[in-house]
A protein has these predicted regions:
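AMP-dependent adenylate-forming
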Residues: 10-36, 166-168, 175, 326, ...
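ANL superfamily adenylate-forming
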Residues: 29, 97-98, 102, 106, ...
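Conserved AMP-binding/adenylate-forming core of the ANL superfamily
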Residues: 23-74, 94-101, 157-160, 183-189
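Conserved AMP-binding/adenylation subdomain of ANL enzymes
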Residues: 189-208, 218-260, 275-280, 339
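Conserved AMP-binding/adenylate-forming
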Residues: 290-292, 299-438, 446-448
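Conserved C-terminal "lid"/linker of ANL adenylate-forming enzymes
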Residues: 475-479, 490-491, 508-556
């Protein structure tokens, strides 16, 4: 990390002046707002002055529920300059008051002890409803467009140190109620310089990042805002809802701005492969793209290979594909596949995998797992059994990590901290194995389905079911329930009501043929019935709870 600033604020102050480098924000109307670094820096200091005028002091938290990317980034940086601790929060899929969403806001803001929350005019009504809830009745709610206007009051910037909290990243809640991950400036700088430095993506002066990822989530926030500021990498940011409506715009922006680095979860590569037409292909040029990263959810080899094949016509280089592994507790990524080399796919015997051993196989029925690469320099991984003892090569166990990117616990949550952080190691809760130095992720330990003594990974079942015509791919959950003293498999999938009977039969038959499992129940649900986290991950445990209490809506 020699030569890099030691805090986010120091990095912001060190960025070059002039018009050539900065952040470009794409609006919902497709208009572009360009902020050179100097303008970002000036507006951050201006907003810092407004925030401290509210009586906020260094170390205080401030909630950010901003659907507008430029408002989010400017306010986050303003809070950082003021020594405050931003708390990024999902701004909601719609701007309507719903009990569940407002309850989530209340929980996060109350847990973070935030006295102030900044939003935008379009979601002001929703966020203001917090004042009617017990945990946040005294909170101050301000719309950025209305608050940061006029001449800024006097302001003296506090000294920011590497040990200071940079922000609180509340976990997605895919496995539990959200917890506040404490990211210090030293964690952020260590991770950013690792994944963007020579041992990671190998940032060059000519790089341009292009992203549609949500900024309340670590991949978008650190990967394309905070990390890029620390290493001076210009970016183009488009709104997440715009990607959902027009996936091809992601690739159009890469083409227009000669993007070199982008990142997305598995589902996004699948979506553009399916939705971009042959006519669209003729207008795209992806030859500039040297990094097409993938992470944040299970990675499917077939998805990435199909993407590479389809977009080879646009100059896409398959060696740009870069699978990775990480979690909020390690800031962002902690392992990368080696850039510029072909993706590695491990084909293993499914029967042996159910016994917890990844035995190579050439059989057509072999499971395909994608290598997530090796840890960054200065970081370590371990794979251990239930007793905490290291396991051998190709033996499945829990993945542990440690290093300067890894944080030191959850905000005012000693119980959760003690459970996940032991003897300097972060216990991820993820199952995986190592082969030839590479890490392969199998799934979450708590989601493992054990039937007749055999281990089954829910995402394997979900992927197979998602390939059935009529099932909404990416909208399938598999979980186990106890019945008569044994674990039984339940599958819930979103699909068409008219196909309900056929889909149930086809799903049960395919799962039996592929895994030797007979589902106790197959539920076919309407679109949107299955719960997801704010980052789009399936909530298996919540789905299970809803199913067990007869709350999971099914087609008749």
């Amino acid at each position: 990390m020699t030569g890099y600033p030691t805090t986010l604020v120091a990095a912001l102050d060190a960025l070059p002046g002039g018009e050539a480098r900065g952040f470009r924000f794409i609006g919902s109307d497709r208009e572009e707002r360009y902020f050179p670094y100097e303008a970002l820096r000036a507006e951050a200091h201006r907003r810092a002055a407004f925030l401290t005028s509210l009586g906020l002091k260094k170390g205080d938290t401030v909630g950010l529920v901003c659907p507008e990317n430029h408002e989010f980034v400017l306010t986050f940086l303003g809070a950082s300059v003021a020594g405050l601790v931003p708390v990024p929060i999902f701004p909601g899929a719609t701007f309507k008051v719903t009990d569940h969403y407002v309850e989530t806001l209340e929980h996060i803001l109350a847990a973070a002890h935030s006295r102030v929350v900044i939003c935008n005019e379009k979601n002001l009504e929703v966020v203001s409803s917090l004042k009617q809830r017990e945990g946040t009745k005294d909170i101050t709610v301000l719309a950025a467009e209305q608050f940061f206007v006029g001449q800024a009051p006097p302001f003296i910037a506090p000294v920011i140190t590497p040990e200071d909290l940079c922000f609180l990243q509340f976990t997605s809640g895919s496995t539990s109620r959200p917890k506040g991950v404490m990211i210090r400036h030293r964690n952020l700088v260590a991770n950013s310089t690792s994944f963007l430095g020579p041992g990671g993506l190998g940032r060059t002066p000519d790089d341009v990042g292009v992203s549609w990822l949500p900024l309340f989530h670590d991949m978008g926030l650190i990967g394309f805002v905070l990390g890029t500021l620390i290493v001076d990498l210009p970016v183009v940011l488009m709104p997440t809802p715009m990607f959902a409506r027009m996936p091809r715009l992601w690739l159009e922006l890469i083409t227009k701005h000669r993007g070199t680095i982008t990142y997305a979860p598995n589902f996004a590569y699948q979506l553009v492969t399916k939705r971009v037409t042959d006519k669209d292909l003729a207008t795209l040029d992806l030859s500039s793209l040297r990094i097409a990263g993938c992470g944040a959810e299970p990675i499917r080899a077939r998805t990435l290979l199909e993407f590479a094949d389809r977009f080879s016509k646009c100059g896409f280089d398959p060696k740009a594909l870069l699978p990775s592994y990480g979690m909020a507790e390690s800031c962002l990524a902690i392992t990368f596949h080696q850039r510029g080399t072909p993706m590695i796919v491990d084909r293993v015997d499914p029967a042996k995998m159910r016994e917890g051993v990844a035995v190579p196989s050439t059989d057509p029925s072999a499971l395909e797992l994608v290598s997530c690469g090796v840890p960054f320099p200065g970081h370590e991984l371990a794979v251990v059994d239930e007793s905490g003892a290291p396991v051998g090569e190709r033996v499945v166990g829990q993945v542990l990590s440690r290093g300067p990117s890894v944080n030191d616990g959850y905000f005012e949550n000693p119980e959760a901290t003690a459970e996940s952080f032991k003897d300097g190691w972060l216990y991820s809760g993820d199952l995986g194995y190592r082969a030839d130095g590479n890490l392969y992720i199998c799934g979450r330990a708590k989601d493992l389905i054990i039937v007749n003594g055999a281990n089954h990974y829910p995402q394997d079942i979900e992927w197979v079911v998602g390939d059935i015509e009529g099932v909404r791919r990416g909208n399938v959950v598999a979980f186990s329930v106890m019945r008569d003293g044994t674990e039984q498999l339940v599958i819930a999938a979103e699909g068409n009501s008219g196909d309900s009977a056929r889909l149930k039969q086809q799903i049960a038959q395919l799962v039996q043929e592929t895994f030797g499992l007979t589902p106790m129940h197959v539920a076919i649900c309407p679109v949107g019935a299955l719960p997801k986290t704010s980052s789009g991950k399936a909530q298996r445990r919540k789905s299970k709870t809803m199913w067990e209490s007869s709350q999971l809506e099914e087609h008749p």
